[in-house]
């Protein structure tokens, strides 16, 4: 894999649409010499509808806005207490295929949860990471000009009830889970560094630098 410095941005709690636009701008403007970046963020409550999304999977959004997204997949929910990690990687330069990246992201979460004694696994029929039959992490990516954006959303200590207003990722009755069901002291503040360390390990430990925002 190509070795270079990865820039890491810890963005805190942000509106989904502003971060989505920033990802598009970054991807459109980057060139072959641009550093890859990883963005760690939480979002204000929002349902995002992926490219494959069908309106009937949004059951009763109520007061939570619904935003169209160009990531892969169907509808999901983002809210405070969910750690989102966006991966802005030059896949061509890192010699990664799209399937490779999906597997890498799933393994990042599996390894992170294993450190806390939580046994999790991906599913071939439904992308994401699961504990038993319950989904704890959602994935959605977009590739443009050989570069990835969007990423994963790991449920840490969030309110899961808004997921009842949708068919998560297009699956009616899909049960959702969060880390605090097994590890009560988990927060996004202590999960984000673990996620970052695990994805960097799977990328062969490139140097990285936190960028102030």
Curated annotation (Swiss-Prot):
Its main location: cytoplasm. It is an enzyme of class 2 (transferase). The keyword Acyltransferase applies. Substrate binds at residues 71-78, 138-140, 151-153. It catalyses: octanoyl-[ACP] + L-lysyl-[protein] = N(6)-octanoyl-L-lysyl-[protein] + holo-[ACP] + H(+). The record marks 135 as: Lowers pKa of active site Cys. One of its GO terms (cellular component) is cytoplasm. One of its GO terms (molecular function) is lipoyl(octanoyl) transferase activity. It is found in: Cytoplasm. It comes from the Bacteria. Its EC number is 2.3.1.181. Keywords: Acyltransferase, Cytoplasm, Transferase. One of its GO terms (biological process) is protein modification process. Residues 32-207 form the BPL/LPL catalytic domain. Pathway: Protein modification; protein lipoylation via endogenous pathway; protein N(6)-(lipoyl)lysine from octanoyl-[acyl-carrier-protein]: step 1/2. InterPro entries: aa-tRNA-synth_II/BPL/LPL, BPL_LPL_catalytic, Octanoyltransferase, Octanoyltransferase_CS. The active site is at 169 (acyl-thioester intermediate). Catalyzes the transfer of endogenously produced octanoic acid from octanoyl-acyl-carrier-protein onto the lipoyl domains of lipoate-dependent enzymes. Lipoyl-ACP can also act as a substrate although octanoyl-ACP is likely to be the physiological substrate. Belongs to the LipB family. In the reaction, the free carboxyl group of octanoic acid is attached via an amide linkage to the epsilon-amino group of a specific lysine residue of lipoyl domains of lipoate-dependent enzymes. This is Octanoyltransferase. It comes from Salmonella typhi. The lineage of its organism: Bacteria, Pseudomonadati, Pseudomonadota, Gammaproteobacteria, Enterobacterales. The gene is lipB.
